[in-house]
């Protein structure tokens, strides 16, 4: 059955100027936006993101790749899955590929989305060609953070009756580096604002269960790990652990960049993605290559 293509507004207030009205595929419980042709690259957003987080990539890479950016389950126009776990998220990524008519794809993940990419590569290795892992980590709590305390801190605003729209600007400015433009911030705030509170809550409950350190060596897909030199959420040290544990990885550290590399320096990020995925034309693995 062909995918239904509908036009929907991605964002309403408070930042309708930055709403992205475009072709969005809605197939069953999953929604995604796609652009371009070529080898498929699936973009997986972070905890406070949505498919709109990837607009610079959807526009900047569409001449080389079929770019697919989803709303993860419980976010945007995608219905929740219960329980929300890394296993059910990975299975949802595989279901997205099925519904998009894709056998094997590159996965590009930011932060929480990078964790999704890792779990998908472990759970559905035959579906994954190459990985781009930006501002992410191989495990929660590498700095000793207590999961219960972290959840309580992240949920305090929602427990007090605030919405994602209420907290979006403060959260994003606290994690971004100085290179984030006003327009890029507005786009990210608008995307965060459309996250349902229930979806954000479920994601916060899920995230501390992430730990794939002992299984990284089982991932055969070549990986590009991108870290921000100013990232305090997932510091460079986390990316080094990740790159060291993978079979075939290279690590790039972007000086002066915080936790939102895909939005802070989109042209640089797109160039890295274009070069790395381009080396895997035909969706076949390549030999190891390191860049520190």
What are these regions (language model features)?
Residues 109, 113, 117:
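Gly/Ala-rich beta-loop-alpha elbow adjacent to hydrolase catalytic centers
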Residues 142-148, 161-217:
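Conserved alpha/beta-hydrolase catalytic His-Asp/Glu region
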Residues 219, 225-227:
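Short beta-strand/loop motif that positions the catalytic acidic residue
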Residues 249-292:
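Catalytic active-site module of serine/aspartate enzymes centered on a nucleophile-bearing elbow/loop
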Residues 118, 122-123, 129-160:
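Flexible "cap/lid" loop of the alpha/beta hydrolase fold
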Residues 88-105:
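Conserved acidic catalytic loop of the alpha/beta-hydrolase fold
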Residues 229-234:
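Acidic catalytic loop of the alpha/beta-hydrolase fold
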Residues 28-79, 96:
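Conserved HGGG/HGGXW glycine-rich cap/lid loop of the alpha/beta-hydrolase fold
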């Amino acid at each position: 059955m062909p995918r239904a293509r509908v036009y929907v507004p991605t964002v309403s207030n408070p930042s309708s100027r930055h709403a992205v009205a475009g072709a969005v595929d809605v197939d069953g419980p999953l929604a995604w936006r796609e652009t371009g042709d070529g080898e498929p690259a699936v973009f997986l957003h972070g905890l406070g993101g949505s498919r709109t987080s990837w607009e610079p990539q959807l526009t900047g890479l569409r001449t080389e790749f079929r770019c697919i950016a989803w709303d993860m389950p419980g976010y945007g126009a995608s219905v929740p899955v219960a329980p929300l776990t890394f296993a059910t998220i990975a299975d949802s990524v595989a279901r997205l590929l099925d519904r998009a008519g894709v056998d094997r794809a590159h996965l590009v993940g930011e932060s929480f989305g990078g964790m999704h990419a890792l779990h998908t590569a472990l759970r559905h290795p035959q579906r994954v060609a190459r990985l781009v892992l930006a501002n992410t980590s191989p495990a929660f709590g590498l700095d000793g953070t207590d999961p219960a305390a972290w959840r309580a801190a992240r949920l305090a605003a929602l427990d007090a009756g605030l919405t994602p729209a209420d907290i979006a600007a403060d959260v994003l400015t606290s994690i971004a580096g100085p290179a984030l433009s006003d327009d890029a911030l507005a786009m990210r705030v608008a995307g965060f604002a459309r996250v349902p509170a229930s979806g954000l809550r479920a994601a916060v409950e899920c995230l501390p269960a992430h730990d794939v350190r002992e299984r990284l060596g089982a991932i055969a897909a070549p990986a590009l790990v991108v870290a921000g030199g100013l990232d305090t959420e997932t510091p460079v040290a986390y990316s080094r652990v990740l790159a060291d544990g993978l079979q075939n990885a290279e690590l790039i550290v972007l000086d002066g960049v915080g936790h939102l590399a895909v939005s802070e320096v989109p042209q640089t990020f797109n160039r890295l993605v274009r070069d790395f995925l381009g080396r895997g034309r035909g969706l076949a693995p390549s030999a190891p290559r390191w860049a520190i």
